[in-house]
Amino acid sequence: MRRLMVLGNLLLAAFPAAAAPPAAPDCSVPNEIVEDNPRLPELAEHLQQKHPVTIVVIGGASTAGLASGNAAEYAYPQRLAVALKQRYPGVPITVLNKGVSRQTTQEMIDRFPRDVFALAPTLVIWETGTFDAARSVDVDVFSAALTSGLAELKEHKLETMLINMQYSRSTASVINFMPYLETMQHIADVDGVYLFRRFEMMKYWAENGIFSFAEVPVERRTELAAQVYQCLADRLADAIAHAITTP
């Protein structure tokens, strides 16, 4: 129960939203955290030919963006849409946010027919694992679900990018993320899926004093969450740019 309370506090959205997107600090990270080997050739072709691009982001509470206080503006899928349109002017880009709070990997898969397949996206970004770890879902069950979900996406010929768990010192002190992180990395390597290492990225930010919820007054935490989402979106745009580049 304490794990879920800590996770809930991390994602809390009980404060008023800021009037405009707050400026994010310099949140660059080492290339090895962002870059991965798999490529996204279909997305690359769409961007090069300026064909319409639809990206579905399916995930949990952090995808929904509740902690920012204004999910419609500040959630990272919304900020990703802005970042990609700036990088690829003239390309019609739509990013659809399909985040639902407190769902396991299997519960997200159950939404695939409605929230992914029916939308025929160019790219699927799948953020998962945080709630599985918080609920201590058996790692073998988590592994089987993730493998099954990726197989379904592959059957529908959908390019996919995985996003691993969130990191904060408070959650890491009560939740053992490591088996889930290792499982995601292994499955991504075996399946040739691009893994966006959000956990390692957020840990880098925390260790380098870029973001720290513990040191910020409660009334400023929605602003900080919005900054984190902006940085995630910017780094995701970096990852996509890397993944569409021919080696």
Label each residue range with its predicted role:
Residues 14-20:
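N-terminal signal peptide c-region/cleavage motif recognized by signal peptidases
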